[in-house]
């Protein structure tokens, strides 16, 4: 997909407690890290009698040392820190949302489309974006929803 193919919309996101594993890793290690992190989060929340309240997600912020990654699940309640799993939250408020369907290698184009939409519509990013994975890596054309928290640009 190119940027022209993406349909970006502004949505209101409800704040949601999450359980996550965080690390700074080389970008090429992200797929393996995500698999391990999701498995660990599911084990910890099950042991705490919590359930996933949504699809797995990832938040990625480039740093000098690699990519800062936060991977986990929205939860039915707050998680107590255990092993590498920590409580966090998906921020509430306005966000730009765009669906990418296809290889994860192409998801940057969806991020670029959301960034351009913000600029074209009087909004700016209010925090790092996150990706919600609707399908697993075994699906030929996986669906990834990108959310970019945003705020109106002040004149």
Per-region residue spans from a language model:
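A solvent-exposed interaction/effector surface
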Residues: 1-155
């Amino acid at each position: 997909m190119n940027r022209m193919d993406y349909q970006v919309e502004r949505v209101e996101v409800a704040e949601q407690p999450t359980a996550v594993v965080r690390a700074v890793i080389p970008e090429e290690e992200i797929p393996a890290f995500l698999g391990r992190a999701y498995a660990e989060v599911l084990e910890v929340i099950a042991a705490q009698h919590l359930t996933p309240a949504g699809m797995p997600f990832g938040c990625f912020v480039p740093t000098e040392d690699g990519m800062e990654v936060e991977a986990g699940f929205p939860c039915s309640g707050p998680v107590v820190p255990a092993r590498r799993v920590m409580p966090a939250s998906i921020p509430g408020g306005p966000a730009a949302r765009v669906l990418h369907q296809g290889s994860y290698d192409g998801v940057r184009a969806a991020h670029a489309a959301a960034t351009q939409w913000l600029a074209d519509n009087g909004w700016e990013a209010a925090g790092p974006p996150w990706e919600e994975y609707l399908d697993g890596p075994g699906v030929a054309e996986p669906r990834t929803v990108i959310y970019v928290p945003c705020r109106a640009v002040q004149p």
